Amino acid sequence: MKTATAVLLGLATATATTCDIYDAAGTPCVAAHSLTRSLYASYSGRLYQIKRSSDKATLNINTTPGGVADTSAQDFFCAQTTCTVEIIYDQSSRQNHLTTAPPGGAHNKSDAGVAASKAKTTMHRQPVYGAYFEGGMGYRIDNSNGVAVGDEAESMYMVAGGRHYNGGCCFDYGNAETNNLDTGAGSMEAIYFGNSSGWGRAKGKGPWIMADLENGLWAGRERVGPGPSIDAEYVTAMLKG
């Protein structure tokens, strides 16, 4: 059965129920990650966990009754200090929670979590925080449940900040190897956003949405041509594999 993964790290509407839409089409979400809101109309609970730098205490940030992240709890908890995001909870029933990534073939140190309060925006007049990624930051799950393997059909989508990007390798969200190693060309499927041009490029100077298929970024060809450079505050990216 085809499945979907969804991430929402930026702005969206609280009434959108992304994974309900996927489920109605027969492609249920097997992972649903968001720092800003619920991705199911019926979901209420944990969105992410933060850690306070002053004493290493942790706090789960839950949804409010409207489905938006309860950032007032975060602001109180992190007052007079700083916090990082340690866990991004999976809202689907699969429990595919993301934690900071372990060492791997491309990076021999564990990744750090993002600053919890750096990507501030609003949703329905409520302040929320996205995930502001910088070098050496990332999340992963290696013991995933129900995620496509091999050449099984899957799709994924991501909402990202359109003004924050770089040319490094590689800002992705998607389905990668579960051993943290490069196991060869074509061994992963993930959405890439940025202006890296070392393995592939689209039109203009970027940034672009491309597919990271391992050992290459795919901008499109033949039936689906390379896309344009993107100039927008927020970007919705989709990949069907």
Where do the language-model regions lie?
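Intrinsically disordered, low-complexity boundary segments flanking structured domains
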Residues: 6, 17-19, 34-37, 73, ...
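Extracellular glycan-recognition modules
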Residues: 85, 93-231
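Short non-domain terminal segments
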Residues: 7, 74-75, 131, 191
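Short tryptophan-centered beta-strand motifs in secreted/extracellular beta-sheet-rich domains
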Residues: 225, 232-241
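Short, flexible beta-strand-to-coil junctions
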Residues: 41-44, 49-57, 133-137, 160-165, ...
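GGW-centered surface loops in extracellular recognition modules
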Residues: 15-108, 150, 157
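Context-gated lysine
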Residues: 2, 51, 56, 109, ...
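Fungal secretory targeting signals
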Residues: 1-16
